Amino acid sequence: MLMKQINLSLVFILLFSCSKDFDRKELNFLNQNFKQWNEYLGDKARTHYSSLNQINKSNVKTLKKVWEYKSGDLNGKNTTQIQCSPIVIDSILYGTNPVTKLFAINAKTGKELWKFDHGQDVGPGWWGVNRGLIYWDDKVDGRIIYTSGSYIYSVDALTGKIENTFGDKGKIDLRKNLGRPFETLSVVANTPGVVYKNILIQGTRVHEGPGASPGHIRAYDLDTGDLVWRFNTIPQPGEYGYETWPKDAYKYVGGANSWAGMTLDEETGIVYIPTGSASYDFWGGNRKGENLFANSLIALDANNGNRLWHFQFVHHDLWDRDLPAPPNLVNINIEGKLIKAVAQVTKSGHVFVFDRKTGNHIFPVKEFPFPKSELEDEESWPTQPLPTKIPPFARQEFTKDMINDMFPNSKALLAWTPNQKEKVSDKTIKEVFETLNSQGQFHPHSEEKRSITFPGLDGGAEWGGAAFDPNSGWLYVNSNEMPWVSIANKYDTPKEWEWQLKKDPVKSYGKSIYSQQCSRCHGADLDGISNIPGLKNLKNKFNKNELSLIIKNGKGSMMPMPQVSESQIKAMTAFLLDDDNIDLDLNSFRELDPNIVPYSINYFGRFMDENGYPAVKPPWGTLNAIDLNKGEIVWQVPLGEYEELTKQGFSITGTENYGGPILTDGGLIFIGATNDEY
């Protein structure tokens, strides 16, 4: 736990340690010596590596806190978080606070130099998450480029003043230039893009339900904010990959976005961009086909956005298997030959390694057959690619012999967090397991039987990504091993005039829209999930106008929903308020298709026991070292601890973990990722 508490302060110390000069050719594979931390995750190669070695295995235990900075905006509801990985430029540390206000502090003293307030009302949810910053040397004072909500801001690095010559008075609206009416789009960017020459290349995060925004990759001129190029991740007529979708999919399908960040090889001018699934994530009957470039690693010419090569990790994704982190540029030695490669970790617990220029596999990958989906109108892809040389760093299937037997008589809990005690079953973990479908990766969801996703929705690997040691060629990645449980719920989706046959057509329509857009967070039964509130008895709290505004504009951690039309908002309001007096022209229901989907995949959440421990045997979180020269896992250890279990004599179990590792030449790995906050 000490490592987690000191992680940020320690990073700052590492960045400012003086280092003797030395010549190591093996360190200079990107014409740098890894002594700076002026880029997200250390450098544009995303190595997470520092060559500084003054802090090492012999003295790390003597580290003490030398200063503390309070960034402000603490949320009293215990939902405050800072995901931002700071950067340091000329002894100034830049970061963002819980509501994404940008700050600059003296990295030696912790004294605040300035703070920039964007003036947006962002909450603690994904709408207000920022994971990193970009410094751009504009040959004047330098600028900090960062995102908050739907905007990219350009701020003077020395003064904290916005650069009014950039974009629209210092900012760019990420909802624009996507080929659809921007007022109807919900778009943010929680991870920084990358700068090549004077071009900013930026990905986005979008809504994951029906009607989501497309995830096209865009490049902007950093002097003006003007759009330079756009790569369509959902191809349009005449573009490569267009035939892998229905002919009009580019008009209505969303997602295939890059929320995880990207990686740049400045020597070749190639940018490597990982993407997520198409929306809706769990049912694809309205997007039949392979769905390029969703779930892909795309190599683009950074000058113009032209595609050089790509690889798709999941065809026609139905499991939300987004690529979770930017890839690592790696130099590896295979049988005496130097290979310049790019390595991508996945939520399913795999590492894929490619030749940087050609996209050829360095280690073999094979297409494996998987069962066909039985859901209405769904056409799952018959095969999925998996590596056959590098072993997975997470277990791939939850089998009966893996049931947690630490407390054999414990009842089962199906919930997002262990705080939902009301969802404790009257059956044991083993008894509940017997009722579930657990067949491993890429098995389709079912209407008839609840299914286990393992590793769960949060990996495998997560957004913290992997670290690469350029000396050894080893990759270090943390991983989750938590089972999640789901079932496909079919709901009423009549078309056009058929709604008129319903007993309460307006409220029925509203319930259908709610199921698609809101049930994933607030629950299919309006009871809420985890710390997300339930929506029962809203008529005692809001009138129809107040509730309509909340649905449209969002509130707190709830994102705005511009993709929901006025008639849909009216119908949802009627349903949520149980109001029979809201009139709606039934002809407006004709606007439904093509984004109406007949299923909501209801995630009961993590499969745990009544004490909040995972239903699967440990380890529940691991740290892994993988030798990319040989394609072998060198070691794997539990990451994280439940102290109360250790005191009872159990071996360290590991915990779920999200942040990524930092690797140093002092022989150390620092990682502040686990949830064991004692």
Tell me what each language-model feature is:
Residues 188-221, 318-403, 458-467, 563-571:
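Repeat-solenoid scaffold signature
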Residues 59-72, 102-123, 140, 152-184, ...:
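Extracytoplasmic/lumenal domain signature
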Residues 43, 394, 403, 407-415, ...:
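Periplasmic c-type cytochrome electron-transfer domains
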Residues 84-99, 458-486, 497-522, 592-678:
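C-terminal substrate/ligand-recognition segments
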